[in-house]
Amino acid sequence: MARVTVEDCLEHVDNRFELVMLSTKRARQLATGGKEPKVAWENDKPTVVALREIAEGLIDYAAIAEAEIVEDEPLFAAFEDESNEAV
């Protein structure tokens, strides 16, 4: 297991605040199973894996933003039904 330092991550991110935001979003993606890790998991927690990906320059805001784009979901049928008019 490789040790991850803040300094390693800051080489790829502008400041600590952005590092926290980016690593949080990526860790959530990994924890919920939405995305596959880009580094070996090595029995680490999702937060550590996210920081390792950032430190190696594999994850940035463009990669996170691409994953957050969600297709519009159709409205429920109840909203399309004319019998549900406002009183």
Curated annotation (Swiss-Prot):
Pfam families attached to this UniProt entry: RNA_pol_Rpb6
Keyword Nucleotidyltransferase applies: yes
Disulfide bonds: none
Any single biological process term in GO: DNA-templated transcription
Enzyme Commission number, as recorded: 2.7.7.6
Alphabetical UniProt keywords: DNA-directed RNA polymerase, Nucleotidyltransferase, Transcription, Transferase
GO MF annotation: an example: DNA-directed RNA polymerase activity
Enzyme category, top tier: transferase
InterPro entries per UniProt: DNA-dir_RNA_pol_omega (IPR003716), Pol_omega/Rpo6/RPB6 (IPR006110), RPB6/omega-like_sf (IPR036161)
Gene Ontology cellular component terms for the protein in this record: DNA-directed RNA polymerase complex
Catalytic activity entry: RNA(n) + a ribonucleoside 5'-triphosphate = RNA(n+1) + diphosphate
Gene3D superfamilies found in the cross-reference section: 3.90.940.10
Assembly behavior: The RNAP catalytic core consists of 2 alpha, 1 beta, 1 beta' and 1 omega subunit. When a sigma factor is associated with the core the holoenzyme is formed, which can initiate transcription.
Family membership: Belongs to the RNA polymerase subunit omega family.
Name of protein: DNA-directed RNA polymerase subunit omega
Organism: Pseudomonas fluorescens (strain ATCC BAA-477 / NRRL B-23932 / Pf-5)
Lineage of producing organism: Bacteria, Pseudomonadati, Pseudomonadota, Gammaproteobacteria, Pseudomonadales
UniProt gene name: rpoZ
